[in-house]
């Protein structure tokens, strides 16, 4: 058995949800209704996020990148946490419903690209199109977009100890199959609604301290 950590990006590794930041800055007002339908689960994540990015003109690509470089902040303790998992031979993956054009640049030099799973984007037309290379497998039929529970099944064995770190509705299906969940923000609400045990966190120092205790118990 090995310990596998599966970590969300937007609102988890970063302090803010970058997709929502992009929408607030660059999308027209109708994006708000789509966002609310995603959170209420009236729209699947795949449908909703596709609709959101179809509201953004592709000629804003450079402006969006510059905006995120200037505003995105990595959550406190993340760099030290990555060093901690390396030192303890813990497998670490970023499984993000975010987009390649901002996830890769913001994690460059911190996480190897082969440990990052995210969505792809096409800027060749008038509006941004999202591609979904990590869709649901046969065990999930809810149109996640990037299916985190499917990736967990793909990247690990059933007897591994699965840790999920997340903050929102997009992390719920992964949390359902995790052995331990670190949650903040809206994921806490969804965990409580679904009777999923979780440990709340605000910084990666919190996560590291709890994981250190877990390693001592399992030693």
Curated annotation (Swiss-Prot):
It comes from the Bacteria. This is 2-hydroxy-3-keto-5-methylthiopentenyl-1-phosphate phosphatase. Keywords: Amino-acid biosynthesis, Hydrolase, Methionine biosynthesis. Dephosphorylates 2-hydroxy-3-keto-5-methylthiopentenyl-1-phosphate (HK-MTPenyl-1-P) yielding 1,2-dihydroxy-3-keto-5-methylthiopentene (DHK-MTPene). GO terms for cellular component: cytoplasm. Pathway: Amino-acid biosynthesis; L-methionine biosynthesis via salvage pathway; L-methionine from S-methyl-5-thio-alpha-D-ribose 1-phosphate: step 4/6. Belongs to the HAD-like hydrolase superfamily. MtnX family. Its EC number is 3.1.3.87. One of its GO terms (biological process) is L-methionine salvage from methylthioadenosine. PANTHER family: PHOSPHORIC MONOESTER HYDROLASE, UPF0655 PROTEIN YCR015C. One of its GO terms (molecular function) is 2-hydroxy-3-keto-5-methylthiopentenyl-1-phosphate phosphatase activity. It catalyses: 2-hydroxy-5-methylsulfanyl-3-oxopent-1-enyl phosphate + H2O = 1,2-dihydroxy-5-(methylsulfanyl)pent-1-en-3-one + phosphate. It is an enzyme of class 3 (hydrolase). InterPro entries: HAD-like_hydrolase_phosphatase, HAD-like_sf, HAD-SF_hydro_IB_MtnX, HAD_hydro_PyrdxlP_Pase-like, HAD_sf.
């Amino acid at each position: 058995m090995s310990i596998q950590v599966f970590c969300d990006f937007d609102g988890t590794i970063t302090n803010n949800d970058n997709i929502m930041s992009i929408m607030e800055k660059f999308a027209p007002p109708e994006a708000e209704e789509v966002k609310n339908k995603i959170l209420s689960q009236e729209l699947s994540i795949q449908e909703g996020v596709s609709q959101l990015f179809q509201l953004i003109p592709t000629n804003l690509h450079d402006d969006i990148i510059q905006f995120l470089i200037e505003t995105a902040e990595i959550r406190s303790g993340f760099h030290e946490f990555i060093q901690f998992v390396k030192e303890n031979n813990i497998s670490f993956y970023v499984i993000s419903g975010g987009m390649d054009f901002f996830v890769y640049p913001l994690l460059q030099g911190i996480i190897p690209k082969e440990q990052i799973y995210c969505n792809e984007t096409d800027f060749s037309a008038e509006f941004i199109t999202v591609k979904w290379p990590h869709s649901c497998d046969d065990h999930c039929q809810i149109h996640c977009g990037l299916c985190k529970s499917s990736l967990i099944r793909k990247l690990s064995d059933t007897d591994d100890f699965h840790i999920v770190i997340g903050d929102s509705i997009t992390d719920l299906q992964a949390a359902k199959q995790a052995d331990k969940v670190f949650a903040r923000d809206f994921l806490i609400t969804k965990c409580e609604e679904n009777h999923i045990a979780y440990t709340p966190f605000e910084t990666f120092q919190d996560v590291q301290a709890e994981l250190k205790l877990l390693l001592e118990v399992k030693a």
